[in-house]
Swiss-Prot record:
Domain (ATP-cone) ranges: 49-139
Co-factor note (free text): Binds 1 zinc ion.
Keywords, ordered alphabetically: ATP-binding, DNA-binding, Metal-binding, Nucleotide-binding, Repressor, Transcription, Transcription regulation, Zinc, Zinc-finger
Alphabetized PROSITE patterns for the sequence: ATP_CONE
Protein name listed in UniProt: Transcriptional repressor NrdR
GO biological process, alphabetically ordered: negative regulation of DNA-templated transcription
Zinc finger map (unnamed): 3-34
Source organism superkingdom: Bacteria
Gene name linked to the record: nrdR
């Protein structure tokens, strides 16, 4: 590994540990030439996921778009940014584990809404209003009724 300070390629690993819920390895290194200490991360290279948009266009999956949408939807709800990042990590992992490399944006939106419904009704409605393109109050009422119906079904199962 090349030292960021002196560009020497000789370094030793001081410490290694799992990071990002076991999906990467964090290594603390020391340059054998200048004694500079630095951190590296090792991850499995993944095959890109293609998202099929509503208008028929295809684009590479961009986790930051999901995270930005979640951050906006979750403002002033008390949900921590770390929790949102974990949610996006889990979503990306689920997409990577699928056999196909192409996914509809609608499927991604529904996966996000499923997780939000358990975390915050306010965030759910905010995200759904943009994702499902709400046009009026009736759309908001229908979304809230859907949340409550799902909660009642879960309570009946338990």
């Amino acid at each position: 590994m090349q030292c960021p300070s002196c560009q020497n390629t000789d370094s030793r690993v001081l410490e290694s540990r799992a990071a990002d819920a076991g999906r990467s390895v964090r290594r603390r290194r020391e340059c054998l030439h200048c004694d500079f200490r630095f951190t590296t991360y090792e991850r499995v290279e993944t095959v890109p996921i293609t998202v099929l948009k509503r208008n028929g266009n295809r684009e590479t999956f961009n986790r930051s778009k999901i995270l930005n949408g979640l951050t906006l939807a979750c403002q002033k709800t008390g949900l921590e940014q770390d929790r949102l990042e974990s949610m996006v990590n889990e979503l990306e992992l689920q997409l990577q584990q699928r056999s196909g490399r192409e996914v509809n944006s609608a499927e991604i939106g529904e996966m996000v809404l499923d997780q939000l419904s358990e975390m915050s009704e306010v965030a759910y409605v905010r995200f759904a209003s943009v994702y499902r393109d709400f046009r009026g109050v009736n759309d908001f009422v229908a979304a809230l009724e859907g949340i409550h119906a799902n909660k009642e079904q879960l309570a009946a199962v338990r």
